[in-house]
């Protein structure tokens, strides 16, 4: 009875401690100007990505870590506040007049924050540059309220899955539309150097991205690249060095002793349940059964027995534990063998900007080399950008923006719940199975080239991934992608006079293109693993994407008597997209290390594809506000 009472006490105490780890904070956010609730205000725990947004009544509820002391409350056009954590809050937000004078990049133009009625979030370059990310989409992590970002593969250079407007159908894409310098972007998002970005605006509601039609149904991310600044030539050189590590700790897994003791316990439980033996008799029977069935678990001649005693003598039947005088013949941790030791990340950026004779220019070069958490994985990127804007007359301006990027990635299998996924299989592999081939003394064996030989488990039990070694695929197989990305944007603008009868009237023509040349390859060695039965396999594919957009926009933006503001847009846009691909797969290599199709004997697959489509749009938008309301 005392033991039961003690256990109940511990259980209740544990529940109380778990509950105490977070504190529920509720409250309302109200405008100090009119005492009306603020809808969509962002409330974030300072220094974390834990946050929420207010509902239609300006109310919110948030589970805050008990260690947190401060909440950051923000909203477009309001001053950001830091509030002390309390269980019930009533937050008054003050108008930020300086912020209201800022402009928001919207579809086919800009708007003042004060008069903008849609839902948008602006991320300026100061926040972007504080994050050492390789992919633009990663810069959105935790910075935009209501936007869900998920990092899936963890491969170096990979981005985040961005969901702005929630999930639709199961099979439909949730990806937002990316717009770079006013033109929808079809290139690789990782081809854009985050250091070249001036700001990003996330258009979250349907009205804000309506002019893009169905392409903007999942939300729109407006990317504005850096432009030249007035003044003399300014040169900036930026260098970053760092190391990567796991964001979350590894799962706790069994060691060799714990694994064998668990096997013994399962045999013992079976003897009790199936044969009705007493615990003492079941222990003896279990040890005998383990010894007779050793080949099914430990392979031929108990080659996967990591201890220096045979299985029948390894477990103490009284305690169910591995005998204390047993020592390990070998020990190889699969996750340790797979992961790199402090993978290096290095980045260099050269930026030059200035102006001369009413012409502003910006030129940048960038290089990124990012090693992955898994050995042999890597991402490299070379980028170059030129932005030029010039004013020929007070009624005639033009500009050009070009970007080139070459990316190269060496990857691994990490995106499936299968044995080929290294993170998945390395943590599920029983600790008694070694990564490398071992001699009778438990020492690693080396091949003629001096490299350690991997154990593909040809005598490993079928339930333990026989004839496969996921870690060996990092070294013996190859997975890679090489991309060349070229993008261009150009415009010419007439009008936009500051006075006279045509004040506020402007005609702009924009042209932009995106070109991607992508080469993928997958190589399986001819000796072991996935393609050993066909003496190796090599698959290569080439994809070419080309799109261009040409639009003509007529805008009229004028304010009368400092009270009435009219913003009118009418336009036409033509969009054309083409994709072509060519792929082939061959098998039958005379030896390993051949990475060209000509070296193989048998064609197993060959295909090609070409597709295209066009979109023609007519645009219209009219806005009116009275005294910026």
Task: Please provide the spans of the model-predicted regions.
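Outer-membrane beta-barrel channels and translocator barrels
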Residues: 133, 230, 345, 356-357, ...
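Structural motif corresponding to the C-terminal cap of alpha-helices
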Residues: 367, 371, 494-498, 556-558, ...
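Residues on the lipid-exposed face of transmembrane beta-strands in outer-membrane beta-barrel proteins
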Residues: 225, 350-354, 384-390, 488-494, ...
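Conserved alpha/beta core surface patches that mediate binding of polyanionic ligands
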Residues: 344-348, 615-618, 628
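Short, small/polar-rich motifs associated with maturation and membrane association
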Residues: 1-385, 397-399, 403-405, 460, ...
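Exposed, low-structure sequence patches enriched in small/polar residues
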Residues: 571, 619-625, 629
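Short glycine/proline-enriched loop/turn "hinge" motifs that connect secondary-structure elements
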Residues: 352-357, 525, 589-592, 623
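Surface-exposed loop/interface segments of Gram-negative outer-membrane beta-barrel transport/assembly proteins
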Residues: 114, 230-330, 372-379, 383, ...
């Amino acid at each position: 009875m005392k033991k039961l009472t003690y256990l109940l006490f511990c259980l209740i105490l544990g529940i109380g401690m778990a509950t105490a780890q977070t504190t529920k904070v509720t409250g309302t956010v109200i405008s100090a100007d009119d005492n009306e609730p603020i809808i969509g205000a962002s409330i974030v725990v300072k220094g974390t990505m834990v946050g929420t947004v207010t509902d239609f009544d300006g109310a919110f509820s948030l589970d805050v870590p008990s260690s947190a002391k401060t909440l950051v409350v923000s909203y477009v056009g309001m001053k950001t506040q830091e509030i002390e954590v309390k269980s019930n809050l009533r937050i008054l937000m003050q108008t930020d007049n300086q912020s209201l004078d800022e402009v928001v990049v919207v579809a086919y133009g800009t708007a003042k924050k004060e008069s903008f009625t849609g839902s948008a979030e602006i991320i300026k370059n100061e926040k972007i540059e504080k994050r050492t990310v390789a992919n633009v989409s990663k810069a959105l992590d935790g910075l935009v309220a209501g936007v869900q970002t998920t990092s899936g593969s963890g491969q170096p250079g990979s981005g985040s899955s961005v969901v702005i407007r929630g999930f639709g159908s199961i099979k439909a894409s949730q990806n937002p539309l990316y717009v770079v310098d006013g033109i929808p972007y079809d290139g690789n998002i990782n081809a854009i150097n985050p250091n070249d970005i001036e700001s990003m605006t996330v258009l979250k509601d349907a009205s804000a991205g309506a002019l893009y039609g169905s392409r903007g149904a999942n939300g729109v991310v407006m990317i504005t690249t850096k432009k030249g600044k007035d003044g003399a030539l300014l040169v900036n050189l930026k260098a970053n060095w760092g190391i990567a590590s796991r964001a979350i700790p590894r799962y706790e897994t069994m060691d060799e002793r714990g694994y064998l003791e668990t096997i013994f316990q399962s045999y013992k439980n079976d003897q009790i349940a199936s044969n009705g033996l007493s615990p003492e008799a079941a222990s003896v029977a279990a040890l005998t059964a383990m010894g007779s069935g050793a080949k099914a678990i430990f392979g031929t001649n108990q080659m996967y027995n990591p201890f220096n005693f045979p299985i029948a003598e390894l477990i103490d039947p009284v305690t169910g534990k591995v005998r204390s005088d047993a020592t390990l013949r070998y020990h190889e941790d699969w996750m340790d063998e797979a992961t790199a030791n402090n993978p290096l990340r290095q980045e260099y950026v050269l930026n030059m900007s200035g102006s001369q004779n009413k012409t502003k220019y910006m030129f940048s070069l960038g290089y990124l080399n990012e090693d992955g958490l898994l050995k042999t994985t890597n991402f490299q990127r070379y980028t170059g950008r030129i932005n030029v804007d010039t004013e020929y007359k007070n009624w005639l301006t033009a500009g050009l923006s070009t970007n080139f990027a070459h990316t190269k990635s060496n990857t691994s299998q990490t995106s499936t719940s299968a044995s080929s996924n290294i993170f998945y299989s390395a943590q599920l592999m029983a600790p008694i199975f070694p990564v490398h081939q071992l001699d009778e003394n438990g020492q690693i064996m080396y091949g003629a080239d001096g490299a350690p030989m991997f154990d593909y488990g040809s005598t490993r039990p079928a339930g333990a991934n026989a004839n496969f070694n996921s870690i060996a695929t990092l070294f013996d197989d190859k997975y890679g992608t090489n991309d060349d990305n070229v993008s261009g944007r150009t415009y010419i603008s007439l009008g936009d006079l500051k006075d006279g009868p045509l004040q506020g009237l402007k005609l702009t023509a924009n042209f932009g293109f995106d070109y991607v040349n992508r080469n993928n390859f997958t190589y399986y060695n001819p000796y072991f693993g996935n393609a050993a039965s066909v003496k190796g396999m090599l698959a290569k594919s080439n994809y070419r994407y080309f799109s261009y957009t040409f639009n003509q926009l007529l805008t009229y933006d004028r304010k009368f008597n400092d009270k009435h503001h009219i913003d009118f847009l009418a336009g036409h846009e033509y969009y054309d997209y083409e994709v072509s691909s060519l792929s082939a797969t061959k098998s039958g290599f005379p030896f390993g290390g051949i990475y060209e199709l000509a070296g193989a004997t048998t064609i197993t697959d060959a295909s090609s594809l070409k597709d295209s489509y066009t979109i023609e749009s007519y645009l219209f938008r009219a806005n009116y506000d009275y005294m910026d309301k």
